[in-house]
Amino acid sequence: EDSIELLISQLDNNDQDIYNTIVESLLAIARVNPINENKQNQIADEINTIAEKVYTLNECLNMLPDDEHKFLMEDYLNNEIQNTLPTLLKLGVLDVPETPIETYIHTIKSGDPSKLPFLLEFFENVFSKNEREVINPLIEQLPLDERSKIGNLHFKSMPTNFNQKLIESVYSPNKWESAIALDYLLF
């Protein structure tokens, strides 16, 4: 119980790699000793926080101007989504830790559209209704503008100005994000 409390207290989405490691640790602990219900509200808050982060990344991709300078920024945003989405799914199964989520993540990453209905049905039985409404569109193969509408429906603080988001990113504690944003602004 103390380990779970300590790990949850260390969750900080400014460093996604550390965040991912902490969620991996929480999942490993939950598979041995289920996380009690009073921690589930904290985990639900984390699910919303990380889902909002993924929708924000998608929104930035959607707002990214289609020009010759977009390659590095687009690659960074896609990489961040691919790095963050599995952690969101792992957070979502902490209350049912025996779920073979790693297999499902691998299936999602493979991009096989024939397996998508199976995955969505599985998540139908694992995630709460609210979690499904937020998480499933991130798994489905949707156009960016449709995913953008869903993000704006669920989260009121979605970015609306790409240049403003770039300026914020320059001052990010994530040095890679800061460098890429600065590089993009200079060109």
Where are these regions (language model features)?
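Alpha-helical adaptor scaffolds
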Residues: P137-K175
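Alpha-solenoid repeat junctions
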Residues: E1, L26, A30-P34, G92, ...
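Extended repeat-based solenoid scaffolds, especially LRR ectodomains
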Residues: Q42-E98, T103-I108
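Amphipathic alpha-helical scaffolding segments comprising HEAT/armadillo-like alpha-solenoid repeats
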Residues: D2-D12, V32-N48, D67-K70, P97-H106, ...
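Boundary/linker elements of alpha-helical solenoid repeat scaffolds
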Residues: E1, P34-N38, E68-M73, Q82-L89, ...
